[in-house]
Curated annotation (Swiss-Prot):
E.C. number: 3.1.-.-
UniProt key word Cytoplasm: yes
Organism: Nocardia farcinica (strain IFM 10152)
Protein name: Putative pre-16S rRNA nuclease
Enzyme class: hydrolase
Species lineage: Bacteria, Bacillati, Actinomycetota, Actinomycetes, Mycobacteriales
GO molecular function: nuclease activity
HAMAP family linked to this entry: Nuclease_YqgF
Length: 180
C-alpha cells in the first residue's frame, strides 16, 4: 500500500510543533472543517464547505481553494484529513475520494503537512452526539460535517498529546539516569 493511502499516527520526528491544526471531513456533498487552538488541545468547528462538482482539469476546484484559504487564515501547521475505511479496515470509494482530495490539497499548500487519519464511524458518532444534544435531523445537515471534522481532529490531538507526553517522559528518564 502506498504511504499516501495509509492512515498516519502522530510522530515526534515529523511533528511541526506548536500551532493550529485543521481537521477535514471529506464528504461527497460537503466538507467539514475544524480547527484546534494553537496549543493543540481542543478542536472546534470552523465551517462547512460545499463540495465542488466537476472541475476542468488543470484548475483548482473551489472547495480546495477555500480549504487552502482557511489553512492560510488560521496559519495551520498541519492538516488532518479523515480517511474513511470500512469496518474491516479496507479502502472503499470514500477513502479513495479522501486520498485524492488530500493529494490535491497537498499541491495547493505544499509547505503544510497533510496527514491522513482513520475516521471510521466519525459521522455516525457525530450524528448521535448531535441528536443526543437535541439537534433535529433537519438542523444536523448543516453541522454534521463540522462535528465529524471536530471528532477527527480531536482524536488526532489526543493521540498527539499522549505520544508527545510519552516521548517527554522517556527523555526525562534518560537524562535523569545520566546524572547517576
Amino acid at each position: 500500500m502506498d504511504a499516501q493511502e495509509r492512515s498516519e499516527r502522530p510522530d515526534p520526528a515529523t511533528d511541526p510543533g506548536r500551532g493550529r491544526r485543521l481537521g477535514i471531513d471529506v464528504g461527497s456533498v460537503r466538507i467539514g472543517v475544524a480547527s484546534s487552538d494553537p496549543d493543540g488541545i481542543l478542536a472546534t468547528p470552523v465551517e462547512t464547505v460545499p463540495r465542488a462538482k466537476k472541475v476542468p482539469r488543470g484548475t483548482v476546484s473551489p472547495d480546495i481553494a477555500r480549504i487552502a484559504e482557511i489553512v492560510r487564515e488560521y496559519e495551520a501547521v498541519e492538516v488532518i484529513v479523515g480517511l474513511p475505511r470500512t469496518l474491516r479496515g479496507e479502502k472503499g470509494s470514500a477513502a479513495t475520494a479522501a486520498i485524492a482530495f488530500a493529494e490535491r490539497l497537498r499541491r495547493e499548500i505544499p509547505d503544510v503537512a497533510i496527514r491522513l487519519s482513520d475516521e471510521r464511524l466519525t459521522t455516525v458518532s457525530a450524528a448521535r452526539a448531535l441528536r443526543d444534544s437535541g439537534v433535529r435531523a433537519r438542523g444536523q445537515r448543516q453541522v454534521i460535517d463540522q462535528a465529524a471534522a471536530v471528532s477527527i481532529l480531536q482524536g488526532w490531538l489526543d493521540e498527539r498529546s499522549a505520544v508527545m507526553r510519552s516521548v517527554g517522559e522517556a527523555e526525562s528518564a534518560t537524562s535523569s539516569g545520566d546524572d547517576a
